[in-house]
Structures are given as C-alpha cells and as structure tokens.
C-alpha cells in the first residue's frame, strides 16, 4: 500500500515477484491547481483505499494466502522524513495485518520507487549502485549499498524537482495535474522542434532547475 501526494496505490505480489493485482488511482485535483494540501490528499486516500483494498482481496485465492502486509510510512528512509499522507496507508495496513493475523513491514516511498524497478531489472543483484529518482517532488542521485546499509544522496537538484517543472508548465498549457503523461503524448505527436532552453550547468553533481521553468514560461508568452 502506498499513499503518496498524488496517487493511491494497492498491489498484491507473490513470493516470486509476480504481480497478481495492481491498482493505481490519481487523486482529484481541481483544474488549474498545481497539487493538493496534505489534509485534502489524506482525506481522498481515506475515501479511495477501502474500494481498492476490497478489489485486491476479492479473489479468495489471494485473500486466503496473504502472508504479510507492507506499506509506505514516509517519503525517504532518513530521520525526520515525514508527510501526513502516508499515515492513511499505514493506518489501513496495520489494521489489515491485525485482522488477518499476519506481520507487516514498513518502507519509504522512495525505497518503493527504487525496488519496483530494481527487482525486475538486470540490476536486481548489483550492489552497490547509483539510482536516479525523478518525480513530482524529487530529483536525486542516490548511492545505495545494501550490505553497508547506505542510502545516501550524492547528487540532484538544489531547488525544484523535474516533476515540478513539468507540472507547472503543463498547468500553464491548460493540462490537468499531474501533467507528465499528457506532456509525453504531446511530445510523441509533435512535428519538428526548436531549442528554447539553455544547457543546464552541473556543479559537483547538483543542478538548479528553476531556470527551466522560467525559460518555458517566457516561451509560452
């Protein structure tokens, strides 16, 4: 179970890693808005989770063989990382585990992103490795070492995230938030192109991305 800022997610996976059920539903954001307050996002998760969980457990073969429940509890696996939205999924996860008499395991939203890709790739057993996490609130390069327990930021953005740039530009174009998928479709259909952005400068593994938003805004004007 994962309850992030913009999406309610519930999945069922067997011991081999096969996905038996996968439900992802975006939270509702008003036209022209660039996101949700934590309180509104939490409320929507509480409303959407019961139906998603019911669908996940509707198959008797799945429901009668659940061995554990896992859920995200915070954005990153570092001390002090916290967002109220994750308490929605954590609360439901603990309740389900107690009702079924099975153990539960906590993880961070960022670890979920990384492991969801890593597990099904050729990097499954590679250690250590550097992962790149680009999302609506994160643009980071992370050094991951399972044996030493290292999960360290070694690069990324000093200001806003790539996802924020895409969403802000997309909303300016009149697209619904979040805008990434719609912008991808526009890019695929585009005929020709012209360069409107200056190259991004990197300093010791870090970049600043707010200038991209400014340049895109001027281009739209």
Where are these regions (language model features)?
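A short helix-loop
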Residues: 3, 11, 22, 125-126, ...
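Short glycine-rich, Thr/Ser-proximal phosphate-binding strand/loop in the N-terminal lobe
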Residues: 4-43, 150-153
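Acidic, glycine-rich active-site loops and adjacent beta-strand->loop/helix elements
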Residues: 7, 72-77, 108-114, 138
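A glycine- and small-aliphatic-rich helix-loop capping segment at beta-alpha/alpha-beta transitions
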Residues: 14-19, 84-95, 100-102, 120-125, ...
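Short, well-ordered amphipathic alpha-helical segments that serve as non-catalytic structural scaffolds
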Residues: 23-25, 44-60
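Short beta-strand-loop/turn "lid" adjacent to the catalytic site in phosphate-handling enzymes
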Residues: 54-94
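Conserved phosphate-binding catalytic cores of ATP/NTP-utilizing and phosphoryl-transfer enzymes
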Residues: 102-130
């Amino acid at each position: 179970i994962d309850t992030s800022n913009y999406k309610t997610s519930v999945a069922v996976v067997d011991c081999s890693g096969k996905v038996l059920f996968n439900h992802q539903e975006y939270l509702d954001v008003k036209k022209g808005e660039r996101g949700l307050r934590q309180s509104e996002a939490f409320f929507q998760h509480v409303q959407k989770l019961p139906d998603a969980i019911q669908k996940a457990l509707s198959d008797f073969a799945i429901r009668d063989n659940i061995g554990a429940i896992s859920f995200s509890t915070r954005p990153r696996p570092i001390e002090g990382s916290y967002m109220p939205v994750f308490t929605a999924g954590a609360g439901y996860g603990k309740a389900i585990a107690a009702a079924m008499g099975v153990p539960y395991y906590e993880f961070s939203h960022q670890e979920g992103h990384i492991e969801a890709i890593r597990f099904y790739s050729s990097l499954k057993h590679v250690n250590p490795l550097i992962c790149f996490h680009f999302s609506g609130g994160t643009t980071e390069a992370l050094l991951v070492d399972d044996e030493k327990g290292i999960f360290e930021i070694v690069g990324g953005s000093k200001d806003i995230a790539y996802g924020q740039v895409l969403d802000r530009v997309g909303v300016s174009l009149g697209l619904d938030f979040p805008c990434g998928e719609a912008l991808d479709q526009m890019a695929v259909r585009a005929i020709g192109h012209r360069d409107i952005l200056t190259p991004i400068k990197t300093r010791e593994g870090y970049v600043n991305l707010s200038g991209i938003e400014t340049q895109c805004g001027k281009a739209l004007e």
